[in-house]
């Protein structure tokens, strides 16, 4: 059998194959089993290559993977940023190229380590997970599509997230890939490599321990007080959402759906999505009074997504916020989005990039919230994660440490239409529930609205672009 050095082009094909398998392991389509073998072709291609060659192969795999996972960015940039497709694709490839540097760096470091006697069986999972963690905060952080998130539907496996976060599962998946790679090398290489007996045994033991822990957690009964929530998915078309002419119709939709959801009696919590009201709730008295009257009528605490502002002398700070209204119609709290979307809600280093606002229409000028603030409902505190804050474990953990017993994710994924983005977004919020052992409810303008218990069960979820106003009760801690 010819060595893998014989046909360089084949090495790039194999690296690209790893990228394709990685992309397919995330929703949609979400063939999660592929994640456990997806990196084997890349590892085989790297073989005994020079570290610089391994870097290029890792970059190829990463570029293909992230291009397949994040294709939906073009939908938002072209449709709502009003950029030409050619410009959008350049921006998209720049992002995919940046993210591809992480698997490229992994391949490079692992090969250099092997040249110095450090086994890939140890180095590969450690370096992969270490770089996943760095990616979660470097350059504002973008922990999208970490390996472990591919398993969000495999509940016995993901229970370890309350101990290790998503990174524990990423480690297991990376270890599985490198063990399989070494087994194949042992069969196929000219110079027979030693079979990774110890590493394979460790992998099996870790998987058995993970599954045992998972099944144990899944069979523990929930104990606590009942809690009822009504989630409102208004399905407001993004193209008219901010048109003042549609404000009346938008408020009317949420009034109607909220009344139907609470027709059998008050809910402990009613949740409207991110920016459900397309105006400043603080000073649009005509509609604000209607919403206050509605909460009194429903006799339910209500979370309302709305932009907000704060004055500091002559300076005005704009915020992406969630207001909590009491059953008596009073605004009793506000939670401001802390982790903003770069180039969506603000321009990083705006002083050095003044041209960006001129190129891309619709970039916001929001300021980050100052602190984590749980909101008290009378039936327990809630922590509100606005939009893609749900992908950051430390934010969810901060709200739970601040006393929140339910996490609430309000979002508007209408930007991405019927792509895989809403499904990928949902998959990450499943981990926030398991990591903190609290239920998480999410209300999305056009979907996916969902109710997730503390073990990661998705108890209810919507389809995209449907009107929904479910009422659900469960036991929470």
Swiss-Prot record:
The active site is at residues 274, 337, 387. The chain crosses the membrane at residues 20-40, 58-78, 89-109, 118-138, 155-175, 195-215. It is a multi-pass membrane protein. GO terms for cellular component: plasma membrane. CDD domains: ALP_N-acyl_transferase. Its main location: membrane. Keywords: Acyltransferase, Cell inner membrane, Cell membrane, Membrane, Transferase, Transmembrane, Transmembrane helix. The keyword Magnesium does not apply. Pathway: Protein modification; lipoprotein biosynthesis (N-acyl transfer). GO terms for molecular function: N-acyltransferase activity. Its EC number is 2.3.1.269. It is found in: Cell inner membrane. Gene3D superfamilies: Carbon-nitrogen hydrolase. It comes from the Bacteria. Residues 232-477 form the CN hydrolase domain. GO terms for biological process: lipoprotein biosynthetic process. Disulfide bonds: none annotated. It is an enzyme of class 2 (transferase). Signal peptide: none annotated. Belongs to the CN hydrolase family. Apolipoprotein N-acyltransferase subfamily. Catalyzes the phospholipid dependent N-acylation of the N-terminal cysteine of apolipoprotein, the last step in lipoprotein maturation. This is Apolipoprotein N-acyltransferase. The gene is lnt.
């Amino acid at each position: 059998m010819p060595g893998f050095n014989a046909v360089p082009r084949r090495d790039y094909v194999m690296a690209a194959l790893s990228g394709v398998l990685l992309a397919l392991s995330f929703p949609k389509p979400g063939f999660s089993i592929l994640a456990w073998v997806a990196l084997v072709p890349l590892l085989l291609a790297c073989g005994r290559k020079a570290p610089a060659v391994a870097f290029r192969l890792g970059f190829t795999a990463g570029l293909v993977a992230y291009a397949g996972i994040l294709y939906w960015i073009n939908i938002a940039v072209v449709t709502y940023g009003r950029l030409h497709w050619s410009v959008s694709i350049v921006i998209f490839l720049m992002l995919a190229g940046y993210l591809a540097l992480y698997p490229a760096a992994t391949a490079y470091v692992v090969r250099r380590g092997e040249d110095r006697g450090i086994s890939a069986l140890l180095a590969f999972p450690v370096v992969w997970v270490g770089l996943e963690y760095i990616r979660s905060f470097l350059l504002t952080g973008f922990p999208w599509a970490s390996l472990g998130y591919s398993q969000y539907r495999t509940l016995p496996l993901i229970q370890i997230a309350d101990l290790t976060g998503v990174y524990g599962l990423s480690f297991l998946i990376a270890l599985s890939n490198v063990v399989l790679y070494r087994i194949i090398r042992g069969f196929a290489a000219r110079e027979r490599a030693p079979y990774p007996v110890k590493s394979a045994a460790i992998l099996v033991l870790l998987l058995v321990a993970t599954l045992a822990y998972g099944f144990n957690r899944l069979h523990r009964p929930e104990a606590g007080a009942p809690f009822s929530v009504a989630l409102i998915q208004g399905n407001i078309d993004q193209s008219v959402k901010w048109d003042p002419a549609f404000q009346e119709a938008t408020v009317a939709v949420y009034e109607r759906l909220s009344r139907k959801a609470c027709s059998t009696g008050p809910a402990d919590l009613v949740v409207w999505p991110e920016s459900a009201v397309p105006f400043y709730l603080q000073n649009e008295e005509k509609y604000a009074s209607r919403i206050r009257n509605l909460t009194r009528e429903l006799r339910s605490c209500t979370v309302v997504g709305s932009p907000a502002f704060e004055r500091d002398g002559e300076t005005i700070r704009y915020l992406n916020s969630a207001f909590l209204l009491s059953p008596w119609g009073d605004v009793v709290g506000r939670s401001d989005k802390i982790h903003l979307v770069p180039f969506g809600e603000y321009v990083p280093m705006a002083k050095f990039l003044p041209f960006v606002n001129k190129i891309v229409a619709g970039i916001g000028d929001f300021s980050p919230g100052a602190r984590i603030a749980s909101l008290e409902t009378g039936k327990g505190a809630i922590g509100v994660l606005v939009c893609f804050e749900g992908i950051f474990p430390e934010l969810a953990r901060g709200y739970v440490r601040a006393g929140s017993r339910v996490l609430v994710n309000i979002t508007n994924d209408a930007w991405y239409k019927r792509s895989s983005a809403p499904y990928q977004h949902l998959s990450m919020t499943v981990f926030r529930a398991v990591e903190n052992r609290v239920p998480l409810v999410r209300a999305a303008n056009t979907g996916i609205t969902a109710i997730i218990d503390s073990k990661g069960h998705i108890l209810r979820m919507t389809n995209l672009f449907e009107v929904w106003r479910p009422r659900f009760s469960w036991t929470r801690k």
